[in-house]
Regions:
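Active-site anion-handling motifs in enzyme catalytic cores
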Residues: 1-360
Length: 360
């Protein structure tokens, strides 16, 4: 009889990065000969990738010895007031309460985070995390795992007393686990745009994009989101309607969104995992008002040129990035470093195999 491995991630938010990490590990573990069940994977994705999904932590922990924590930005810091006032932050910390209580109810079950995300900086846990998150990470049931930013090794050691290893992000192996459907061919330049609302978006830049798309016919602008629309998270910008050169490509599945990214000549995003997904299908990305970790990653691959000025104009963006050849842009990164990261990311999967064989 096959043993079963469980995979936990915050999948109810239907975020493409979390979905892909959980699905990739599930696919890998199934190929090793195990059954797999995932926590709250979207029903359509469950059917598409033939993966079992369960709704509760109890169902996840029953009849297993190991729960893989498949990423998500588990070290995301929240100020105390955000943990009270922000619904998503409250729910996220409540997840850790459920996980911690599960360590008490199922003492034989081990929890292991693989390719876990933070911002690479050491933070005082009591300032940034709920006591449930702290208690879970410090519990004996939560065993040593891996992180995807080297700075988080020290965070896990200092804050939680855990010895984590660093390897490059497991999503570097995306093409091995996900097929995708390309958009119809076109002679136009295709630009993928992922914008956050509010202070993360320059209204003048947006207005100029619309004007250019209306007055010219050489560039298509594809606006993407990283959450499925049915989840109701609306912090990312999408147009009200499509037009001849304005397209709305909200996230439906990894297959669909990877196809959009692969079909574009460049991705403009604030999110590291969106840019990384694009890189794996040979689409260069530039950071627009992105956080420190996105900029740090670009610097690490020789991509200082890809960190856009905060108030870049559309004309500057067009001349410096949009009309440049796709292959030439990609070659501006340090190819040797990217190749090393792709190779090192294999170790995330090898670590997964070792843990599964040891604790299943």
């Amino acid at each position: 009889m096959k043993k079963t491995i469980s995979i936990w991630a915050p999948l109810r938010y239907a975020n493409v990065g979390d979905d892909m990490q959980a699905i990739a590990f599930a696919t890998y573990i199934k190929k090793l000969g195990y059954n797999v069940k995932l926590f709250q994977l979207d029903e359509e994705l469950s059917n598409l990738y033939d993966l079992k999904s369960v709704r509760t932590v109890d169902e996840l922990c029953k009849d297993v010895n190991l729960v893989i924590i498949a990423g998500g930005a588990l070290l995301t810091p929240f100020r105390w007031y955000k943990r009270i006032l922000n619904k998503a932050a409250r729910e996220y910390e409540a997840d850790f309460k459920d996980l911690y209580l599960a360590t008490k109810k199922y003492p034989s079950v081990k929890f292991c985070a693989i390719s876990m995300g933070g911002d690479g900086k050491v933070k005082k846990p009591e300032t940034w995390y709920s006591h449930w998150r702290i208690d879970f990470f410090r519990s004996e049931s939560f065993i040593n795992g891996t992180v995807r930013l080297s700075g988080d090794v020290e965070q896990m050691k200092q804050a939680f007393g855990k010895n984590f290893a660093y390897h490059a992000d497991m999503l570097f192996r995306t093409p091995e686990y996900f097929e995708y459907d390309l958009l119809p061919k076109t002679d136009k330049i295709r630009v993928c745009l992922q914008f956050k609302k509010g202070r993360y978006l320059d209204k003048k830049l947006l207005s100029d994009i619309y004007k250019y798309a209306e007055d010219n016919d050489d560039i298509e602008f594809h606006f993407i989101t990283t959450h499925m629309p049915k989840i109701g998270l609306t912090y990312q910008y999408v147009p009200n309607k499509q037009s001849k050169n304005i397209f709305i490509d909200t996230y439906k599945s990894p297959r669909q969104l990877l196809g959009v990214l692969a079909s574009c000549d460049v991705t403009i995003t604030s999110m590291l995992h969106v840019g990384l997904m694009g890189l794996t299908v040979n689409t260069p990305f530039v950071s627009y008002r992105g956080p420190g970790k996105t900029k740090s990653f670009l610097k690490s691959i020789g991509g200082e040129w890809a960190i856009l000025p905060e108030n870049i104009s559309f004309n500057e963006l067009r001349e410096q990035i949009l009309i440049q050849n796709k292959e030439d842009l990609y070659k501006q990164y340090n190819q040797d470093i990217i190749s090393e990261m792709i190779e090192d990311s294999k170790n995330q999967y090898e670590f997964c195999k070792t843990i599964v064989e040891k604790y299943s």
